[in-house]
Regions:
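Membrane-lumen/periplasm interface segments of specific transmembrane helices
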Residues: 229-316
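Membrane-interface alpha helices of multi-pass inner-membrane proteins
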Residues: 187, 196-210, 215-222, 238-241
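Specific aromatic-rich, kink-prone transmembrane helix
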Residues: 141, 178-197, 359-363
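Short acidic/glycine- and proline-prone juxtamembrane loop motifs at membrane-interface regions
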Residues: 168-178, 349-350
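Interfacial juxtamembrane loops and adjacent helix segments
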Residues: 52-104
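Transmembrane-helix signature of polytopic, membrane-embedded enzymes
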Residues: 125, 140-163, 181
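Hydrophobic, aromatic-rich transmembrane alpha-helices
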Residues: 140, 292-325, 335-339, 360, ...
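Loop-to-helix entry region of an early transmembrane alpha helix in multi-pass inner-membrane enzymes
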Residues: 94-106, 110, 118-137, 301-305
């Protein structure tokens, strides 16, 4: 065995060990711990309804299952910490009026149902398993896709994932880690010039978070750049069809009710809830939330990371030839997608946009041409 092969083997083993240590770390900090958050309850009810049960029984099932699995203090917090939660707990009608916000994540809810049925575990366990498995698969995909990079670049995957809040996402009973897996899966397809597969994953992701249609539309600019107008029309029509069919099937509460209830005032029930639309409120809320987040040490990571990633993704594009190379545009598109999504609904919650930023960060690493950097240094 030559010294070069020995070096390669040693580095490869170190890379594998690093990944396995990261998996163990994630397991210890997430899956091994019991954790419940409110959003898990309507997802459990939504998945239970796929068995043919109605709203009344699914409402009772979700809350009773939570009571049987959680500590009394946790249950009391999730059922009664606010007037909204009390209403969701006490009234199946109020609970059902907000359920479409969760049911429209239809691919995620279906995955919960399938995992629960296949493994014979309850829906809370299925939610927990999906979040953990998504993070493990995401980190594996990143490790595999970037395995041929230098050890220095390869090892940067893991602190980046930690910085992007992957540990709390691994234990949250929400679709955020699942969405992040889909985002980076699509990114690897676009980076590998497999656009059809990338579009397919992006279309599926609309059924996990409907705002992903924004990112899908941005990637369709590839077809516009190449003047493939029929493909552009086809994919755009397919994306809109999936979006509106999903919204119609689950009676989505719509953009403005989501915006108002999340950022202005959460009602105790969505029955009869119809706040008047105010365009000026969108602008003032965006400025107010951004100003608050920048001054908050727990929240300013997100706008700072968006600006850093935007700068880094624009840096290679100063060379005109790079604008013609689609894989060079991938980090930029993911970052712009996060910025637009935040501008439309500025949730002060990093996990909502983490999938976009994880994909942007890892795509930047994938695009680093180490040989070219070495040649320039010489």
């Amino acid at each position: 065995m030559t010294s070069k092969n020995k070096y390669f083997s040693t580095i490869s083993i170190l890379k594998i060990i690093t990944y396995l240590l990261f998996v163990l770390f994630v397991y210890e900090k997430s899956y091994k711990q019991d954790y419940f958050n409110y959003d898990g309850i309507p997802y459990v009810a939504s998945a239970h309804m796929l068995t043919g049960e109605g709203l009344v029984s699914s409402h009772a099932y979700a809350w009773n299952l939570l009571r049987s699995k959680s500590q009394p203090g946790v249950f009391n917090d999730l059922c009664c910490a606010s007037s909204y939660r009390k209403s969701m707990y006490q009234s199946f009608e109020a609970f059902g009026s907000h359920l479409p916000s969760y049911q429209t994540k239809s691919l995620y809810v279906l995955t919960v149902r399938v995992i629960s049925s296949l493994l014979n575990i309850d829906e809370f366990e299925a939610l927990k398993l999906i979040s953990f498995a998504s993070v493990i698969l995401l980190s594996f995909l990143a490790a595999f896709f970037l395995f041929n990079k230098s050890f220095i670049l390869y090892i940067s995957i893991f602190p980046i994932l930690i910085l992007m809040q992957i540990i709390p996402m691994a234990r949250l009973l929400t679709p955020d880690s699942f969405n992040a897996l889909l985002m980076f899966s699509a990114a690897t397809c676009f980076l590998s010039q497999k656009k059809t597969a990338g579009y397919g994953i992006m279309l599926a992701s609309i059924l996990v978070r409907q705002t992903n249609i924004i990112l899908f539309a941005l990637f369709l600019l590839f077809e516009l750049k190449e003047r493939k107008y029929l493909k552009l029309i086809f994919y755009a029509s397919l994306g809109l069809l999936i979006y509106f069919l999903n919204s119609s099937l689950f009676e989505s509460i719509g953009y403005w009710k989501t915006y108002y209830s999340s950022l202005i005032r959460m009602p105790d029930t969505f029955v009869g809830f119809n706040p008047p639309f105010e365009l000026s409120l969108i602008y003032s809320t965006l400025i107010g939330k951004l100003n608050w987040m920048l001054g908050n040490p727990e929240l300013n990571r997100f706008p700072a990371l968006m600006l850093i990633l935007l700068s880094l993704s624009l840096l290679p594009l100063k060379e005109k030839s790079y604008w013609m190379i689609e894989k060079r545009l991938v980090p930029f598109i993911f970052t712009i997608g996060a910025i637009i999504s935040f501008a439309l609904i500025p949730f002060p919650d990093f996990r909502i946009y983490a999938g976009f930023l994880i994909a942007a960060s890892l795509s930047l690493i994938a695009n680093i041409n180490e040989k070219r950097l070495t040649d320039k240094a010489r």
